[in-house]
Amino acid sequence: MILAAALAIVSFAAAFRLYWVFGGNLGYSVSLPQLPDGLPVMAHRLPWWRLAAGGVVICLICLALLLLTRAGHLQLPLSQDLVRFVLLTVGAAFVARAVIPNRYVGFFKGLRTTRWANYDTRLYSPLFLVLGLLTVWQVI
């Protein structure tokens, strides 16, 4: 159940980003943190946006493979200690992203008036928190 929930979140996130890589625009306007005027915080990096989405897809696939390895459904040529370390690190980073106060992201963000902030509070941060906890739980 824990593995299935984690893989469902990872699959959803990877599929959405893959859609962006291949030209999709749904959700694009709320895919990056925004300044009070609505412009993306990293507007100077927008030309790399689709390439970056592809990098995230690769990372999410690796996360899914590590989760499957830890659960015993897949064998990778990696030590169990390394798999555990990576999963704990990623899980802790996801939880931290959701709960550590920051200007643009997380439940305790300082800037709450943008469309991005609304999506982050209601969708992104809860998904990061749940996926982080599920990932850590898969290890312990």
Regions found by a protein language model. Give the residues of each.
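Juxtamembrane boundary at the C-terminal end of a transmembrane helix
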Residues: R70, T135-I140
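Interfacial loop at the N-terminal end of multi-pass membrane proteins
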Residues: F16-G54, H73-Q75, F108-R115
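Core segments of transmembrane alpha-helices
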Residues: R50-L67, Y124-G132
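Transmembrane alpha-helical segments of integral membrane proteins
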Residues: R97-L111
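Alpha-helical transmembrane segments of multi-pass membrane proteins
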Residues: A13, V90-R97
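Individual transmembrane alpha-helices with interfacial aromatic-anchor signatures
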Residues: V83-T89, T114-L131
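N-terminal signal-anchor transmembrane alpha helix
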Residues: L3-F22
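Cytoplasmic juxtamembrane regions at transmembrane-helix boundaries
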Residues: L66-V86
